[in-house]
Amino acid sequence: MLDREGYRPNVGIILINNRNEVFWGKRVREHSWQFPQGGIKPGESPETAMYRELYEEVGLLPQHVKIIGRTRDWLRYDVPNNWVRREWRGSYRGQKQIWYLLRLTGRDCDVNLRATRHPEFDGWRWHQYWAPVDEVIDFKRDVYLGALKELSSRFLRGMESYEDFAARQSSDNR
């Protein structure tokens, strides 16, 4: 299902633990890492889609998490043509996403990447809040950064800013 502008409605999930580290999932049989995300089905609310995707990709149930917040509006990214399925070319531009910030209230052992028959991830880890940004595929990077910035500034008081994190990383690498 695409909107009039060619964007597929989608939800993204930033799952944090009690140390404000983010869940980072490794795509099945790939060397790429990402946050859980997935499409919103017709008639489904973004929140319902978020809980479905959370279970399908991470194996967590609503009782394992607490919603801290969500982005105010859709964040969009365009997918390069060479990444678009042939049958979608011409009408599909990319994804528009509502991002949720969730806190894990359960335990690490509640994560189950094989909760469904078609797992999205075959590995996972906790990562510093800002660290994944540089590892994200380039066409998604601005959306990831936008979601992390908006959600941290609105809901995680005292969190180091991305700019401070990047400056510290730069000076540490010298």
Swiss-Prot record:
> Sorted alphabetically, which InterPro entries does this protein's record hold?
Nudix_hydrolase, NUDIX_hydrolase-like_dom_sf, NUDIX_hydrolase_CS, NUDIX_hydrolase_dom, RppH
SUPFAM superfamilies in UniProt = Nudix
Q: Which domain of life is it from?
A: Bacteria
Per the annotation, the residue ranges of the short sequence motif Nudix box are 38-59
Q: What class of enzyme is it?
A: hydrolase
Q: GO molecular function: any one?
A: mRNA 5'-diphosphatase activity
Q: What is its EC number?
A: 3.6.1.-
The Nudix hydrolase domain covers 6-149
Ordered alphabetically, the record's keywords are: Hydrolase
Q: Which cofactor does it need?
A: a divalent metal cation
GO biological process per UniProt? mRNA catabolic process
Give the family, as the similarity comment puts it. Answer: Belongs to the Nudix hydrolase family. RppH subfamily.
Q: Which NCBIfam families match?
A: PRK00714.1-2 (NF001935), PRK00714.1-4 (NF001937), PRK00714.1-5 (NF001938)
Q: Say what the protein does.
A: Accelerates the degradation of transcripts by removing pyrophosphate from the 5'-end of triphosphorylated RNA, leading to a more labile monophosphorylated state that can stimulate subsequent ribonuclease cleavage.
Name this polypeptide is given: RNA pyrophosphohydrolase
- What is the originating organism of this protein? Neisseria meningitidis serogroup B (strain ATCC BAA-335 / MC58)
